[in-house]
């Protein structure tokens, strides 16, 4: 029993699994057993996990657009989209049910926990089906804003580094730059430069997990504050870092798609967080305030 849990579920140490078994938190066919109990095929294992308090995260969901088929919200950084790990109710999916109980809304694409900005929600059957198709067929345009350190990238640049799974302690695997991964395409342009920072806009034509973080890191310029991905687009030596860790700034800025009834092009934009407003724009705003 102990060997099974400690070798299969690596998120906890062997000693932790032993304590859970000895405390009766894990049952075999409804009965408590010793850590050395030999398991057999066909048995039912039950893990009675203790209740836990979910981490505090921003829960506000600003609605940017709504019609009979879809909504668009401004997701705050730090709020996961779907339940997983330590998060159930502190997620976009569950907060939609709590804050808008009369609606039937479901996220049509994913944003990383640390990513803020535009998130499309299907409201009707047509909206969920057709917008999912547009995402699947790469009809939707997805444009992000982010910030990296000083760089010598050209004003416009591309990255086509493949992204796939690689082994990673604790989690089993993680997505990173990999020659055996799936194709990924990102197209970026420089918005502004300073001695300490570079502001970027990046359009992704594919939707691989953590694509922008991996691609910019693979070019030698990880997102400022990213604890996970280092130069080369692979995890840095900090083996305790996880994909959901924050610290970086990445914003889903614009989404373009076809209207479900008229087929006309629609573009939605999310307000920029203060850290992504470029120096030129800040200067103009200050001059305007003076006048």
Swiss-Prot record:
InterPro entries in alphabetical order: PsdUridine_synth_cat_dom_sf, PsdUridine_synth_RluA-like_CS, PsdUridine_synth_RluC/D, PsdUridine_synth_RsuA/RluA, RluA_PseudoU_synthase, S4_RNA-bd, S4_RNA-bd_sf
Keywords: Isomerase
EC number: 5.4.99.-
SUPFAM superfamilies, alphabetized: Alpha-L RNA-binding motif, Pseudouridine synthase
Protein family membership: Belongs to the pseudouridine synthase RluA family.
Gene Ontology MF term list: pseudouridine synthase activity; RNA binding; rRNA pseudouridine synthase activity
Record flagged with keyword Isomerase: yes
Catalytic function, reaction form: a uridine in RNA = a pseudouridine in RNA
Gene3D superfamilies: Pseudouridine synthase, RNA-binding S4 domain
PROSITE patterns on file: PSI_RLU
The organism's place on the tree of life at top rank: Bacteria
GO biological process: enzyme-directed rRNA pseudouridine synthesis
Protein name: Uncharacterized RNA pseudouridine synthase slr1592
CDD domains from the UniProt entry: PseudoU_synth_RluA_like, S4
């Amino acid at each position: 029993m102990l060997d099974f849990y400690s070798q299969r579920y690596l998120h906890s140490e062997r000693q932790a699994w032993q304590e859970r078994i000895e405390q009766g938190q894990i049952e075999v066919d409804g009965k408590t057993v010793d850590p050395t109990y030999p398991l057999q095929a066909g048995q039912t294992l039950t893990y009675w996990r203790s209740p836990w308090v979910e981490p505090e995260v921003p829960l506000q969901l600003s609605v940017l657009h709504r019609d009979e088929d879809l909504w668009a919200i401004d997701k705050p950084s730090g709020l996961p989209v779907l339940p997983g790990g330590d998060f159930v109710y502190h997620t976009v999916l569950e907060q939609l049910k709590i804050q808008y109980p009369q609606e039937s809304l479901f996220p049509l694409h994913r944003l990383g926990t640390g990513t803020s900005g535009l998130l499309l929600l299907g409201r009707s059957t047509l909206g969920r089906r057709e917008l999912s198709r547009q995402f699947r067929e790469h009809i939707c345009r997805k444009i992000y804003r982010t910030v990296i350190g000083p760089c010598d990238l050209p004003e416009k640049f591309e990255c086509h580094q493949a992204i796939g799974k690689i082994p990673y302690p604790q989690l089993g695997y993680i997505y990173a730059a990999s020659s055996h991964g799936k194709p990924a395409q990102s197209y970026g342009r420089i918005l502004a430069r300073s001695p300490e920072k570079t502001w970027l806009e990046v359009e992704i034509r594919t939707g691989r997990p953590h694509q922008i973080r991996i691609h910019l890191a693979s070019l030698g310029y990880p997102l400022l504050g990213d604890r996970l991905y280092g130069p080369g687009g692979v995890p840095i030596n900090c083996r305790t870092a996880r994909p959901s860790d924050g610290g970086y700034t990445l914003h889903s800025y614009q989404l373009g798609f076809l209207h479900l009834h008229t087929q006309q092009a629609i573009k939605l934009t999310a307000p920029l967080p203060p850290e992504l407003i470029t120096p030129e724009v800040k200067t103009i705003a200050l001059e305007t305030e003076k006048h």
